């Protein structure tokens, strides 16, 4: 499979999605392809970590339903302020997996109102094309052209024993082909193809580590160079940035530099 070796700025020029265009330009201007996964359970720690890591990332990935003291005013509004301060985009890792009408309601409503603040979210392909259509409708109804939204499909996972591989992954790719503008890419471990058909999917990869090989709970880690050389555009790192004994600012810079150098190498700029 051919790995995309174009620069982020070149891809921004030709991409069908306004969200992808914005993300590529942001990555190029900040010189980072790092996404920080902030899985903590209090608003205070959540915002403090994001403020420290913000300068080094292109994306902050949230699991907003983990936060015990969540409120829109105290959690989301400060998050949006930090996104403006540090110039990053927001990815809510919701993993929608229901019929179109249900995911639309989950996306736009409830206490979280995800569509109102998350630039990007994601979904499983298990329920078919309806999940894409439902989320797209939700985005259209709650946002403007000035705040476009994008969707990632879960093609592959980094956990031991994952069922997302082989035929399942290929069928998820077929679902992604149903909407060139709203579906911007995949959560995957490698390039998912599509270039020959005019698609330019962004590949975001979790389970990336510079030090650890696993966590004892099924997570497997691969190196930055390994994932970028096989097609990853954005590396997703969580505990490697702020786990026990780790300084988020030191690790943020370390992972940012490792990811960017791997990208420069892949695109022949280094």
Curated annotation (Swiss-Prot):
Gene Ontology process terms (BP): 'de novo' pyrimidine nucleobase biosynthetic process; 'de novo' UMP biosynthetic process
Chemical reaction(s) catalysed: orotidine 5'-phosphate + H(+) = UMP + CO2
SUPFAM superfamilies registered for this protein in UniProt: Ribulose-phoshate binding barrel
PROSITE patterns in the cross-refs: OMPDECASE
InterPro entries named in the record: Aldolase_TIM, OMPdecase, OMPdecase_AS, OMPdeCOase_dom, RibuloseP-bd_barrel
Enzyme Commission (EC) number: 4.1.1.23
Keywords for this protein: Decarboxylase, Lyase, Pyrimidine biosynthesis
GO molecular function, one term: orotidine-5'-phosphate decarboxylase activity
Catalytic center residues: 95 (proton donor)
Pathway note: Pyrimidine metabolism; UMP biosynthesis via de novo pathway; UMP from orotate: step 2/2
Residues reported in the UniProt entry to bind substrate: 39, 61-63, 93-102, 221, 239
GO annotation, cellular component aspect: cytosol
NCBIfam families for this protein: pyrF
Family named by the database record: Belongs to the OMP decarboxylase family.
PANTHER family to which the protein is assigned, alphabetical: OROTIDINE 5'-PHOSPHATE DECARBOXYLASE
Protein name: Orotidine 5'-phosphate decarboxylase
Organism: Candida dubliniensis (strain CD36 / ATCC MYA-646 / CBS 7987 / NCPF 3949 / NRRL Y-17841) (Yeast)
Lineage: Eukaryota, Fungi, Dikarya, Ascomycota, Saccharomycotina
């Amino acid at each position: 499979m051919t790995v995309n070796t174009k620069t982020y700025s070149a891809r921004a020029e030709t991409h069908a999605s306004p969200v992808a265009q914005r993300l590529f330009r942001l990555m190029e201007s900040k010189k980072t392809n790092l996404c920080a996964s902030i899985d903590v359970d209090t608003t205070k720690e959540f915002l403090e970590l994001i403020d420290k890591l913000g300068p080094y990332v292109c994306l902050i990935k949230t699991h907003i339903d983990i936060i015990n003291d969540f409120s829109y005013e105290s959690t989301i509004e400060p998050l949006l302020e930090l996104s403006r301060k540090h110039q990053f985009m927001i990815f809510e890792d919701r993993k929608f997996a229901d019929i179109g009408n249900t995911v639309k309601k989950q996306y736009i409503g409830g206490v979280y109102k995800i569509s109102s603040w998350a630039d990007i979210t994601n979904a499983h392909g298990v329920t078919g094309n309806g999940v894409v259509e439902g989320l797209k409708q939700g985005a259209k109804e709650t946002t403007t052209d000035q705040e476009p939204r994008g969707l990632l499909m879960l093609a592959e996972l980094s956990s031991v024993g994952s069922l997302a591989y082989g035929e399942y992954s290929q069928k998820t790719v077929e679902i992604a082909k149903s909407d060139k503008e709203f579906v911007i890419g995949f959560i995957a471990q490698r390039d998912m193809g599509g270039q020959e058909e005019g698609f330019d999917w962004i590949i975001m990869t979790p389970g990336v580590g510079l030090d650890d090989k696993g966590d004892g709970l099924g997570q497997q880690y691969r190196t930055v160079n390994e994932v970028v050389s096989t097609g990853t555009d954005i590396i997703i790192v969580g505990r490697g940035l702020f786990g026990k004994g780790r300084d988020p600012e030191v690790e943020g810079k370390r992972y940012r530099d490792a990811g960017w150098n791997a990208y420069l190498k892949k695109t022949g700029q280094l």
